[in-house]
């Protein structure tokens, strides 16, 4: 068993019963692969597949001019290097993007050529096509300086769908069937039955028309239409009746309208009897081929063909005419002996198409097309050309109609064709085939489709969404190019004169910047990032809307199994519309979700793993992952629980064809992080999964004692941690950098084998949380490829650590944990367990106004000296300054116009001169309620504006830091090269060298030490190999130096060039504050099982309930929060966490007692190897065992995987191991070791009942009271009503609503009520009067008329009622 460097340091004991047969795939693969498929940036043009950008270009090009003598052809495209890296884009507020250039060829044909067209001239050129945003390695985009995610969309797959209205449309409850052909791009074609069983069609949900109009428009005659939809009855006409060709099947179930006799005249079926199977057999046995029928049997039947008089050529009757006595007489006159009628019945062969044809008054193909034209373009006069163009453009033109490969595959599969490929447009056969199936459905044969089946919904990922936008932009370009191509020949234009890239840039910018699917990345913690990128939304353009989505779409469907998580979805209006991908799910080539299964052959489980889509899964019988397997790998139960076509069944093992790969394959990443999920109610699990995403990273992350084993995968895949790209030995570390000397076998020849990893330090995330990486390796450690070498936010030794392990006691305490309130020990706050750092970005811009430019300066009047002390000479705050609300961060003055001066201002003007009056102070100040430390300042200056001293100093510091960084890198690189050189040279024979070394002498270490290192290259080894290697290393060092010099120059150029700022902005200053948030009453906290609450009180440690040995609880929770919520998982977590801590304490005691290593190994083996997954501890050296034990002494981490976790017996065994009887007695534990006698900290008396105590991983959520607490005395007022604005963001007031007024009325508090409704709200004159009275020292309220009353009066006047106040 292989352990990575960090896994060895702390092994998580797993209780999994089943071996891991299939690793969890890379969690961000969906996003990265999709966008990579779109760009195909690493492939040479000739090897690119026809998808993504390539497909968009080839679908639009070549563009041909209107006269056909000029065309523009696409050859290839190339993506340039992005001008700025990700970090620079974030700082400057730019988009991380690459310039796209397309190589196009303009071909002009010779108009004068008498024969076929001859090429007159060709011009090739690379044309700029705009910028394409690039995806970062973690699957996000940097757009205008902020990280965004493009959420995948779950939409209805293109293809054909058959459904009915479930009897809701018509009062009789009759099922009305309909079909819809949905293309990827183009017009929708709907077919629908009405209550009278007439079949209609509509295009793009316009007015409905009889379907036979469409059939005529595609060139079918009424005869052909009837032939396609009906079978015919043949009749031979006689003078006094007729003879019907006998078809036995058609008679069964009919009521005989006459006696049926055999040749001898024996009655086989009497009149008015229902014909059954026996009757049919009798008739067949009698050898009857034709049956004589009376005249009235023909009446009312429908003719199948036109009947023409053979002599005159006159049409006697048309197809679809009803037979009447008159018509029969005419037929006999015309000597017609043979007729065919439609066979219909009321049960399973309705005459729907015939009835529809009767409604249709169009006569021929052209008339039908004109009718469609009038429906599509009402009011426009139809001409033959326009009618043809419109009809052919609807479904038959590849430019306007695209079914897509998915649509064609789904279409062909649904209508029963074998081949899954074909044209991307509709054919006449397609149109007809859908109508045939719809008629069959109405006749009672076949099944309608389930729209919510995941075989009918597909996922559109980033790549596909971006491709659609790019194509839309290209289409706009195409129109412009077509017009200009005509002039290309005359004006001698080049390709770049024809193509304007603006429409493309606009389409791309609009999509990434403001599309509903382009979302501001949730960056609270690593889990929220990863979940956001794995989200699948049914909303967005081309999707559903919240209001229209019904219950069925939102519900969990059997096909979600292993594809979409049934648990993780938001509460509220989006429930069920936004989902998360299941852990193992992936997309197939068509965009359908697939999940892996193990192949089972003859009840034997094989190692073959197949990914099945929802469509394929329906054909197989699939067993669950927890089915019992014997030692030979076969299913051992007599009956196995399995799924077939969405139903759970019990089957014999031989019938099973597949088996789940893992018990947790049903759920998403967030849900799979909840231990004992199987014991939680689904609603609470949903809250638990959602709340983990809101956990704020703590100052010191702590791994969960009870996890599920997937924490490491999440931390690594999220990109928060730093992984080694190649194996090697750690050469150097500091807080911001790790340097690894690469193993010889992994380093490439001639390359300098050093990898340098720069860590992210104290960076602001999108949610203002702090992102900070810290190294977890030491100098000299040997690491392998992909080992974790640095932890990020919310990770501990390469594992996700969202919260802290708290000692929890379930007991009431003086009402402080009533209704989910949480009582917390002061020790938790004192130890900074839940302290988090938040980084706030405050910015100020200096604009060029009409009255003159704003100025950032230290010279501000009326600013106190203690405020000025924090500002430097440029007026910008120092780094490291501790600031509180109202402190000035950046001094700024704005010119103001000449206004009427107040007497006070006149006085100031007289004293201080001009300056005081013509500018006003608009400095950047710390907002209310914020206290923090300035950690960074950035100054951006527009090109051409002189930089102030602070801006120049920031640039100089940055360059100096970069130069030191490069020098360090060079030192490390050279040191490594000289080490390799020394190894290679010692003992080699030389031909000569510095310090007059003799020819044939061997190089010694002393000789090399005596030489200056750069003179080593002057040594001339005798063998050519060494000489070449020496030369190669010399060149590689020179090359590296050259590269570093170039990099420094590039950096200097970037820093010294002006910044791109919005129009009118001269200068921008950004100040970053680090705010420390400690836990306080009002903060929201939660466990992982949906058990949320608000901190009600922080209690001194001496008052907390404690155990017999004096250990106080950290958190006291209300036991009543568990039973009704049915999230028992939290109690099981507490028991197992209690064991985890106890085992850690036992290991700590052993280490303190310095026991023999063998004894320590024995104890570790008892923990790890007696149940669940076993660990190979024998492969560990003694030093590694000691390091492992040292990391375990705070608690042994457990993994209890979802649906495959620890059972009661295992938990008890761990408790027995952790708390031997003598220790249990000291702690006052019960015999079962899962409860403890607690003592009141205030009185020292024991509580009446034993209490469940243990460790729970508890999280602090992002709903912090600091962000919500807000107070105001005076502030902004609404313009219309003059009432205070609402909300913290507007610095608003607290609404005193209707019910609050009732409360004051109930108490009779009339004065309070009066001031609430007048001076504290919208009595403008009253407000100013209160100020005046207060200044005079007179505390009297003069209430006047509230402004809202005036608004009411105005509103009534607007209705035309003259209302006025009677004034005394």
Curated annotation (Swiss-Prot):
Q: Which GO terms describe its molecular function?
A: DNA binding; DNA-directed RNA polymerase activity; ribonucleoside binding
How would you classify this enzyme at the top EC level? Answer: transferase
| Biological processes, Gene Ontology terms | DNA-templated transcription
Q: Where is the signal peptide?
A: none
Q: Which residues cross the membrane?
A: none
This protein's UniProt keywords: DNA-directed RNA polymerase, Nucleotidyltransferase, Transcription, Transferase
Its GO CC terms are: DNA-directed RNA polymerase complex
Enzyme Commission designation? 2.7.7.6
Q: Which reaction equations make up its catalytic activity?
A: RNA(n) + a ribonucleoside 5'-triphosphate = RNA(n+1) + diphosphate
Top-level division of the source organism's lineage: Bacteria
Does Iron show up as a keyword for this record?
Answer: no
**NCBIfam families for the chain:** PRK00405.1, rpoB
Assembly mode: The RNAP catalytic core consists of 2 alpha, 1 beta, 1 beta' and 1 omega subunit. When a sigma factor is associated with the core the holoenzyme is formed, which can initiate transcription.
What this chain does, per the entry, is described as: DNA-dependent RNA polymerase catalyzes the transcription of DNA into RNA using the four ribonucleoside triphosphates as substrates.
Concerning PANTHER family, the annotation shows:
DNA-DIRECTED RNA POLYMERASE I SUBUNIT 2
Give the UniProt family note: Belongs to the RNA polymerase beta chain family.
This protein's name: DNA-directed RNA polymerase subunit beta
């Amino acid at each position: 068993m292989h352990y990575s460097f960090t896994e060895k340091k702390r092994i998580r004991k797993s209780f999994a019963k089943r071996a891991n047969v299939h690793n969890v795939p890379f969690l961000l693969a969906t996003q990265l692969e999709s966008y990579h498929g779109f760009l195909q940036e690493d492939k040479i043009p000739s090897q690119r597949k026809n998808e993504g950008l390539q497909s968009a270009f080839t679908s639009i090009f070549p563009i041909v001019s209107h006269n056909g003598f000029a065309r523009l052809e696409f050859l290839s495209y190339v993506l340039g290097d992005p001008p700025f890296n990700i970090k620079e884009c974030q700082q400057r507020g730019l988009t991380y993007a690459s310039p796209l250039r397309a190589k196009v060829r303009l071909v002009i044909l010779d108009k004068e050529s008498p024969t076929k067209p001859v090429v007159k001239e060709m011009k090739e050129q690379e044309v700029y096509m705009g910028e394409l945003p690039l995806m970062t390695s973690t699957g996000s985009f940097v757009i205008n300086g902020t990280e965004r995610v493009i959420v995948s969309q779950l939409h209805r797959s293109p293809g054909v769908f058959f459904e009915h209205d479930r009897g809701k449309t018509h009062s009789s409850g009759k099922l009305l069937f309909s079909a819809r052909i949905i293309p990827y791009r183009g017009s929708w074609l709907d077919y629908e039955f009405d209550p009278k069983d007439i079949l209609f069609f509509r295009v793009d949900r316009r007015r409905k028309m009889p379907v036979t109009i469409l059939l005529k428009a595609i060139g079918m005659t009424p005869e052909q239409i009837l032939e396609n939809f009906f079978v015919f009855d043949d009749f031979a006409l006689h003078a006094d009746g007729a003879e019907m060709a006998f078809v036995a099947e058609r008679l069964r179930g009919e009521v005989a309208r006459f006696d049926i006799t055999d040749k001898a005249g024996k009655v086989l079926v009497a009149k008015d009897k229902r014909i059954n199977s026996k009757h049919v057999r009798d008739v067949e046995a009698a050898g009857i081929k034709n049956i004589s029928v009376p005249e009235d049997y023909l009446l009312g039947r429908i003719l199948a063909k036109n009947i023409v008089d053979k002599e005159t050529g006159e049409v006697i009757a048309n197809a679809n005419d009803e037979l009447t006595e008159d018509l029969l007489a005419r037929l006999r006159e015309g000597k017609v002996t043979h007729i065919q009628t439609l066979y219909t019945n009321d049960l399973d062969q309705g005459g729907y198409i015939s009835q529809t044809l009767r409604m249709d008054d169009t006569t021929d193909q052209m008339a039908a097309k004109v009718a469609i034209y009038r429906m599509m373009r009402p009011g426009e006069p139809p001409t033959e050309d326009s009618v043809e163009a419109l009809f052919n453009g609807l479904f038959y033109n590849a430019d306007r109609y695209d079914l897509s490969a998915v649509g064609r595959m789904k279409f062909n599969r649904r209508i029963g064709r074998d081949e899954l490929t074909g044209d991307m447009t509709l054919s006449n056969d397609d149109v007809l085939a859908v109508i045939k199936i719809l008629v069959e459905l109405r006749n009672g044969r076949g099944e309608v489709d389930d729209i919510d089946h995941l075989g009918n919904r597909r996922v559109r990922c980033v790549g596909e969404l971006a491709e659609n936008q790019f194509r839309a932009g290209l289409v706009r370009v195409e129109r412009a190019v077509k017009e200009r191509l005509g002039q290309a020949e005359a004006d001698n234009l080049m390709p770049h004169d024809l193509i304007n890239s603006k429409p493309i840039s606009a389409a791309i910018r609009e999509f990434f910047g403001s599309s509903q699917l382009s979302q501001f990345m949730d960056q609270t913690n690593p889990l929220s990032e990863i979940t956001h990128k794995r989200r699948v939304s049914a909303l967005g353009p081309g999707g559903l809307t919240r209001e229209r989505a019904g219950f069925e779409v939102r519900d969990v469907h059997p096909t979600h199994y292993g594809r979409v998580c049934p648990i993780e979805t938001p509460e509220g209006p989006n429930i069920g519309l936004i989902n998360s991908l299941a852990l193992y799910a992936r997309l197939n080539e068509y965009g359908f979700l697939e999940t892996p299964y193990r192949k089972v052959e003859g009840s034997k489980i094989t190692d073959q793993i197949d990914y099945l889509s929802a469509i394929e899964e329906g054909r197989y019988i699939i067993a669950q992952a927890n089915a019992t397997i014997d030692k030979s790998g076969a299913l051992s139960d007599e009956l196995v629980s399995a799924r077939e076509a969405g139903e759970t069944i019990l089957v014999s093992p031989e019938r099973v064809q597949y088996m789940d790969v893992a018990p947790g394959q049903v759920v998403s990443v967030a849900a799979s992080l909840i231990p004992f999920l199987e014991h939680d109610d689904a609603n609470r699990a949903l809250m638990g999964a959602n709340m983990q995403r809101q956990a704020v990273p703590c100052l010191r992350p702590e791994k969960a004692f009870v996890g599920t084993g997937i924490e490491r995968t999440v931390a690594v895949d999220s990109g928060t941690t730093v992984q080694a790209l190649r194996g090697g030995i750690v050469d150097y570390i500091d807080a911001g950098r790790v340097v690894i000397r690469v193993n010889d076998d992994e380093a490439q020849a001639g390359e300098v084998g050093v990898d340098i990893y720069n860590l992210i330090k104290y960076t602001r995330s999108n949610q203002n949380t702090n992102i900070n990486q810290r190294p977890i390796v030491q100098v000299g450690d040997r690491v392998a490829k992909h080992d974790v070498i640095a932890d990020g936010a919310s990770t501990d030794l390469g594992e996700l650590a969202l919260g802290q392990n708290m000692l929890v006691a379930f007991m009431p305490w003086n009402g402080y944990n009533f209704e989910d309130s949480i009582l917390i020990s002061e020790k938790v706050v004192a130890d900074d367990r839940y302290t988090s750092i938040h980084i706030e970005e405050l910015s100020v811009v200096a604009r060029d106004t009409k009255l003159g430019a704003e100025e950032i300066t230290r010279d501000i009047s009326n600013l106190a000296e203690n405020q000025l002390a924090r500002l430097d000479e440029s007026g910008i705050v120092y780094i490291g300054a501790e600031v509180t609300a109202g402190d000035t961060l950046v001094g700024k003055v704005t010119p103001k116009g000449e206004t009427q001066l107040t007497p006070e201002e006149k006085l100031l003007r007289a004293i201080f001169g001009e300056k005081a009056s013509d500018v006003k102070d608009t400095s950047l100040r710390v907002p209310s309620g914020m206290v923090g430390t300035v950690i960074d300042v950035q100054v951006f200056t527009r090109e051409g504006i002189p930089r102030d001293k602070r801006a120049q100093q920031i640039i100089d510091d940055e360059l100096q830091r970069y130069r030191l960084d490069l020098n360090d890198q060079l030192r490390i690189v050279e040191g490594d090269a000289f080490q390799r050189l020394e190894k290679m040279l010692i003992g080699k024979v030389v031909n000569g060298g510095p310090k007059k070394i003799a020819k044939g002498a061997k190089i010694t270490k002393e000789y090399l030490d005596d030489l200056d290192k750069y003179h080593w290259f002057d040594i001339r080894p005798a063998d050519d190999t060494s000489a070449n290697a020496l030369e190669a290393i010399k060149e590689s060092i020179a090359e590296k130096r050259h590269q570093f010099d170039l990099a420094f120059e590039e950096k200097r150029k970037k820093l010294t060039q002006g910044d791109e700022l919005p129009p009118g902005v001269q200068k921008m200053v950004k100040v970053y504050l680090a705010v420390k948030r400690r836990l306080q009453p009002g903060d929201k906290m939660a466990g992982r099982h949906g058990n949320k609450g608000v901190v009600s009180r922080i209690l001194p440690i001496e008052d907390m309930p404690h155990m017999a040995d004096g250990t106080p609880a950290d958190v006291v929770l209300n036991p009543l929060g568990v039973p009704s919520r049915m999230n028992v998982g939290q109690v099981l977590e507490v028991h197992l966490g209690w064991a985890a801590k106890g085992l850690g304490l036992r290991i700590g005691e052993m280490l303190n007692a310095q026991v023999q290593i063998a004894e320590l190994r024995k104890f570790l083996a008892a923990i790890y190897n007696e149940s669940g997954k076993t660990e190979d501890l024998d492969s560990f050296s003694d030093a590694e065992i000691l390091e492992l034990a040292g990391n375990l002494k705070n608690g042994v981490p457990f993994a209890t995987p979802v649906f495959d976790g620890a059972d009661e017996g295992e938990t008890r065994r761990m408790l027995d191991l952790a708390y031997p009887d003598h220790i249990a007695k000291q702690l006052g534990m019960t015999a079962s070791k899962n409860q403890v006698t607690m003592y009141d900290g205030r009185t020292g008396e024991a509580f009446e009942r034993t209490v469940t105590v243990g460790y729970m991983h508890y999280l602090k959520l992002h709903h912090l009271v600091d962000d919500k607490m807000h107070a105001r005395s005076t502030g902004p007022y609404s313009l219309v009503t003059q009432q205070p604005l609402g909300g913290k963001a507007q610095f608003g007031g607290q609404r005193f609503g209707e019910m609050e007024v009732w409360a004051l009325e109930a108490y009779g508090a009339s004065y309070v009520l009066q001031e609430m409704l007048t001076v504290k709200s919208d009595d403008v004159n009253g407000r100013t009067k209160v100020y005046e009275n207060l200044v005079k020292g007179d505390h009297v309220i003069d209430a006047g008329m509230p402004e809202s009353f005036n608004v009411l009066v105005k509103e009534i006047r607007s209705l035309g009622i003259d209302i006025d106040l009677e004034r005394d």
